[in-house]
Amino acid sequence: MTNLSGKKSLNTVTLVFKLPYYTQWGQSLLIAGSEPALGSWNVKQGLSLSPVHQGNELIWSGRVSVATGFTCQYNYYVVDDNKNVLRSESGEKRKLVLPEGVQDGDVVEIRDWWQDASEALFLRSAFKNVIFNGSENAKRELKTTSLNKSLEPEDIVVQFIVSCPRLGAGSTVVVTGSNPQLGRWQTQDGLKLNYVGDSIWKANCLLRKSEFPIKYKYCKISEAGVSSLEFGPNREADVDLSSPKPSRYVLLSDGALRESPWRGAGVAVPIFSIRSNEDLGVGEFLDLKLLVDWAVNSGFHLVQLLPINDTSVHGMWWDSYPYSSLSVFALHPLYLRVQALSDAIPGDIKDEISQAKKQLDKKDVDYEASLASKLSIARKIFKLEKDKVLNSSSFKQFLSENEEWLKPYAAFCFLRDFFETSDHSQWGRFSQFSKEKLDKLVSEGTLHHDVICFHYYIQYHLYMQLSEAAAYARKKKVILKGDLPIGVDRNSVDTWVYPTLFRMNTATGAPPDYFDKNGQNWGFPTYNWEEMSKDNYGWWRARLTQMAKYFTAYRIDHILGFFRIWELPDHAATGLVGKFRPSIALSQEELLSEGLWDFDRMSRPYILQETLEEKFGSFWTVIAANFLNEYKKQHYEFKEDCNTEKKIIAKLKNSSEKSLWLEKEDSIRRGLFDLLQNIVLIRDPEDSTKFYPRFNQEDTSSFNDLDEHSKNILRRLYYDYYFARQENLWRQNALKTLPVLLNSSDMLACGEDLGLIPACVHPVMQELGLIGLRIQRMPSEPNLEFGIPSQYSYMTVCAPSCHDCSTLRAWWEEDGGRRSRFYQTVIGSDDEPPSRCTPEVANFIVKQHFDAPSMWAIFPLQDLLALKDKYTTRPAKEETINDPTNPKHYWRFRLHVTLDSLLDDKDIQATIKELVTSSGRSFPGKVDGAEESGEKLAKVQLNGKP
């Protein structure tokens, strides 16, 4: 036994750590902790554990000598032979406090269980501070656990430790078991545990050596005295009495009290889509209070939103796209309620607000008009109240706490308006950001200081209004779930202030998938992860910290981007000809060894005269004359001024020959893009000896005109690149970045994992406790047309649709053949399906999702309104929020009913709540979420004397 405590003390105790854990070959376990005895959090200096087989378990154990007053934090780690971390525990750091009475020479045995990510979920703020309302636990009297009795030689002190976050007000936890001290399985006589904080309950029990082994279980007892025994087999504890010096104290750190899986439900709607009696043509933060009330009445524990950050890049309706952030910290002025800016709004401004309400009360959102109206009114109120607000203590505190992002944001907005562009490369000497320039721009002595302060003022009120709505939701036990976009606009505050964090010569997108057969190009620059890692991803940590001010859960948009991103050159307009970053490319040497040598033939557009004739008919000569050069007989290449997608778009738009193709511009552009994309390999622009297989290469004539030997090699290399060789690289990449996000806040994290999913994604998400997404029409199983909700895994969110696809009603109407197949295979009827999605059909599909095993069932509000004929009068296509195939889609969908009127409709709220309750999902007002089934099981097991 080694003394690693780093302390000189005559009074020492021996700690024996034990943990059951099955490892793979080459793996081992160690402990790292806060004290020198455990490496001071340096894993390589931690306490190594040794494995021993005991029955069906592999027990890892280790000993260390420490001082009698020793306390520490610690965690277990799976490491390789070089002590590199392969896996670490989830949740809070473990805390070790030795029991009172431990004396010099005692042996204290600590028996732990590996902390899985799924267990740690219920310690996240969504559960701890909202659903299970941590304030109830905070109100509990914290008690110490002591015996007040001197020990005899045959005595062993057992400390029971269990986590129980799912506990109603007034409830307690007991341990019941096989011996008298534990009540002989009578829960009312069990050993009561003391609450010690952070959802942890403890109690000491004095047992004689002869009483081992013991069997026991934990049990919740409600304020009314109703017992709910934990699920699963009996827990067991024994001591090794054959040891020369057996353990005097045994700490049974048993993890979480075992309960039936908690399941909840929620509603999803963009803020801009909300309609209320108070809004100015678009939903507002304060409307969330109405939405929360409706959610509670309908049995929902969660409200999910789209991104809410400022997107004011172009100064027009293009900015309606909520995923293209001007700032990842600033809130969007569109969601401001101007009526709440002051308690003393003059009559003329009130009249202007009333007039604006009438003018903006349209079927869809008028993005430009609503934003302009709000900013105009806000400026007038600002002029009247700026001194009062800017000198208030709450504003000064807001500015002080947020100045790191707020001042650059305000300066950016001023410069954007001054130069009439958000492209900061056109701002002259202000193109390059510096702290000195910023300080001058926002200093009080400038002529434009009021403009700077106006942006502060707007952000302050947005913060106050969203904070009010968030506090209201927490009070009502409703989670607000935000959305973390994968990218930022290339003309944004963030790329101006932190240019080295972004690869500005690239664009982010997605390869062809369900959403778009041509792939997607979102235009965001990709991230420079290597640079971001230098400060442990500080920019990301700041983003999550800011989000956590309002939200207790969030959706990670395109979580695949944290494994690998689909990177496109900045001259691309579509998303087809990209490559994954990071990825292991096909090297020139590798291709040569396979017998592939004509790299130019495979990596440049393959354009033959016969292809031109086939694609453009008799018009091919005009196309060739304007866009192509014939470099050898009947073989063509693009001219320099149109050899990229963006150049083609510009030439079609500006050419003097435009009259020749005006009516055919779209088809000509598509045809030229097809020619440009007619390649087999993509040459790396940064290393000409590296290549990447073009996605769907077999769809090209470039591939089809190759010899069979080359085709077979390319097929094999294609599969290897996309589905094999990258898996470990992508796993390691995700394990570098995602844990930083998850540990930056205590929000509950969900990942949007739709599209082309590498095999490594779901295991990593499971390991990290990330909740996935399942959309019925987009099954992750390759051989299914429709997902089967009853077979979804627990760690998922299930939904019949989402904002990136048509609603349930529209989907039903789109394709008659698909509708018939769904009606037959899913609903189970051979009858002719109705041509429209009736409330009965909607009810069946919605109920499928409520009944699913998924932790969350979250429904777009449009799909819930389909449950009642009254709300299905609007054409279904008009309810679609986004069309991913259109990069310039106008995000303007607005509900055709107000939240006020929905709150008055008791019938639909009752219909939805009945679906929630009958599915066994938790709802606001229901305690614990699983009492009934727990009580039934408890009665069965107690009567059977487990």
Curated annotation (Swiss-Prot):
It is found in: Cytoplasm, Cytosol. It catalyses: Transfers a segment of a (1->4)-alpha-D-glucan to a new position in an acceptor, which may be glucose or a (1->4)-alpha-D-glucan. Its EC number is 2.4.1.25. GO terms for cellular component: cytosol. GO terms for biological process: carbohydrate metabolic process. Keywords: Carbohydrate metabolism, Cytoplasm, Glycosyltransferase, Repeat, Transferase. Pfam families: CBM_20 (PF00686), Glyco_hydro_77 (PF02446). One of its GO terms (molecular function) is 4-alpha-glucanotransferase activity. InterPro entries: Carb-bd-like_fold (IPR013784), CBM20 (IPR002044), CBM20_DPE2_1 (IPR034840), CBM20_DPE2_2 (IPR034841), Glyco_hydro_77 (IPR003385), Glycoside_hydrolase_SF (IPR017853), Ig-like_fold (IPR013783). Residues 7-115, 150-264 form the CBM20 domain. Residues 919-946 are annotated as: Disordered. Belongs to the disproportionating enzyme family. Cytosolic alpha-glucanotransferase essential for the cytosolic metabolism of maltose, an intermediate on the pathway by which starch is converted to sucrose in leaves at night. PANTHER family: 4-ALPHA-GLUCANOTRANSFERASE, PTHR32518. This is 4-alpha-glucanotransferase DPE2. It comes from Oryza sativa subsp. japonica (Rice). The gene is DPE2.
